[in-house]
Amino acid sequence: MNNSLDYLAYPVIVSNHRQSTTFRKKLDFGHYILHKNRVQIVKPAVDTKPPMAHTHYILKLSKIQGEQKRIDKIEYENRQLCQKIANAYRGPAKVDCWNEYLSKSLNRESRNRELVRITMENQGILRRLSDRKPNYDRRSSEMDWQNSRRYIRNTTRYLLFQED
């Protein structure tokens, strides 16, 4: 591009000595600058931005809430353990290691009274049942059964049993 004679934007097969390259060079340079400006102004047609980040995708509130509940539970248990340790240090020394836990129910005595009452009632019912004698006669029930069998035999067309 140093020499205007060396420049031909559109080389021709047959060149003429009168052919002026400076005008053609100006036109081509103007088109080049125009093209360069257009390329700089152009915005991409393809969206290359990252997708919109929604907060509820990233910040899971239910997970945070569950984690907070778990932390609260751990802190509560830690406080309970600290209280037990403090009570152990404050209280008298206990050498034996088989102190069994007794349930500290508020209504244990009333439940025990109810259990004793029910047990006594059951024993009374059992005693009354065992003291009772049977009040039916075996001989009369057998006679009734034979009579009913005879009535059935007399009223049916076919025999019920061959051995009767």
Curated annotation (Swiss-Prot):
InterPro entries: CFAP97D1/2 (IPR038792), Hmw/CFAP97 (IPR029488). The keyword Cell division does not apply. One of its GO terms (biological process) is sperm axoneme assembly. Keywords: Coiled coil. Disulfide bonds: none annotated. Disruption phenotype: Male subfertility. Sperm show an impaired ability to penetrate the zona pellucida and abnormal motility characterized by frequent stalling in the anti-hook position with the flagellum and hook of the sperm head pointing in opposite directions. Sperm flagella lack outer microtubule doublet 4 in 63% of mutants while doublet 7 is missing in 14.8% of mutants. The keyword Ribosomal protein does not apply. Expressed exclusively in testis. It comes from the Eukaryota. Residues 61-88 form a coiled coil. Required for male fertility through its role in axonemal doublet stabilization which is essential for sperm motility and fertilization. Belongs to the CFAP97 family. This is Sperm axonemal maintenance protein CFAP97D1. The lineage of its organism: Eukaryota, Metazoa, Chordata, Craniata, Vertebrata.
